[in-house]
């Protein structure tokens, strides 16, 4: 009986030492991940030699499904991996951006797709000379499609100012923030194989600047069609630059025009307002666990 008592005491002392501790989960090495994102942005065989604009578009679109009335959608969950979001016509071509980032995800599995895609958007903007974007980690990846938003939530580029305002109001933006966010059209280009539209908005599609507003105000625009697709867009005089109908609506609507004129004259103001609006975009719908 005494032996049993002593044995129980010894086991009580040793049992914490004999228990296998849970595996140590280290946070993702964000600085290394940022460095690796930067290395994939420059590429010779795509567009103007940069993936930064399309990676910015990936971050934008994975956030822009948010609905403030239901608090659904947004970047949390990385739902663009699932049907129907992956098939939304507004997301055509984004497989290029996702594929470019996939090796980074495989090397650093601790980072969620949702964090990786949004972080890559921040890095892309800064890489192109844009403002510093505040980014916070903590997004999770959903394991199934139950929370995947329906299609049709992204802005349609052939619509009018009412559509723009309705879409951005759903996201929680006012007119100023809306015009600031659309200024991202200053980088990248349209691809007829993805959207049916073709061409670039500015002469510096790899440089983040206020040129979208400058070009929108100062060029002479005429409506035309993309021959291969029949899609209507606007061309400048020498047809080297384009605008979409939603872009033109920014100078037809008085409230939007007010901010277009301000940003065309004041790039630091645009950078400040864009940085704030984009950081807000990245946070839409995020629910972080607190300890």
From Swiss-Prot:
Catalytic residues identified in the record: 61, 201
GO MF annotations, alphabetized: heme binding; metal ion binding; peroxidase activity
Annotated positions binding heme b: 185
Record keywords, A-Z: Heme, Iron, Metal-binding, Oxidoreductase, Peroxidase
Protein's UniProt keywords contain Oxidoreductase: yes
GO terms under biological process: cellular response to oxidative stress; hydrogen peroxide catabolic process; response to reactive oxygen species
Site (Transition state stabilizer) location in chain: 57
Cofactor note: Binds 1 heme b (iron(II)-protoporphyrin IX) group per subunit.
Cofactor(s) needed for function: heme b
Catalytic EC class: oxidoreductase
The enzyme's E.C. designation: 1.11.1.-
Pfam family, one: peroxidase
Family, similarity comment: Belongs to the peroxidase family. Cytochrome c peroxidase subfamily.
Main function: Destroys radicals which are normally produced within the cells and which are toxic to biological systems.
Stated name of the protein: Putative heme-binding peroxidase
């Amino acid at each position: 009986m005494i032996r049993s008592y002593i044995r129980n005491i010894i086991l009580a002392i040793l049992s914490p030492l004999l228990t296998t501790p849970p595996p140590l989960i280290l946070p993702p090495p964000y600085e290394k991940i940022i460095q690796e994102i930067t290395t994939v942005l420059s590429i010779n065989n795509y567009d103007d030699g940069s993936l930064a604009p399309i990676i910015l578009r990936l971050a934008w679109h994975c956030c822009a499904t948010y609905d403030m009335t239901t608090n659904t959608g947004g970047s949390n969950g990385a739902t663009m991996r699932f049907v129907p979001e992956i098939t939304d016509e507004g997301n055509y071509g984004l497989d290029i951006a996702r594929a470019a980032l996939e090796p980074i995800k495989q090397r650093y599995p601790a980072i969620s797709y949702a964090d990786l895609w949004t972080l890559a958007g921040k890095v892309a903007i800064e890489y192109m000379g844009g403002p510093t974007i505040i980014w916070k980690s903590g997004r999770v990846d959903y394991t199934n499609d139950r929370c995947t938003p329906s299609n049709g939530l992204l802005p349609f580029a052939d619509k009018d100012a009412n559509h723009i305002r309705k879409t951005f109001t759903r996201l929680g933006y006012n007119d100023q923030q809306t015009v600031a966010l659309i200024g991202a059209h200053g980088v990248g280009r349209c691809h007829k194989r993805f959207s049916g539209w073709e061409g670039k908005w500015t002469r510096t599609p790899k440089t983040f600047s206020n040129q979208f507003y400058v070009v929108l105000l100062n060029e002479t625009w005429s409506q035309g069609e993309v021959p291969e697709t029949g899609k209507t867009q606007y061309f400048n005089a020498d047809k080297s630059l384009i605008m979409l109908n939603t872009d033109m609506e920014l100078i037809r609507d008085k409230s939007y025009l007010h901010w277009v004129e301000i940003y065309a004259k004041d790039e630091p103001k645009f950078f400040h307002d864009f940085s704030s609006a984009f950081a807000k975009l990245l946070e839409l719908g995020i629910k972080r666990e607190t300890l």
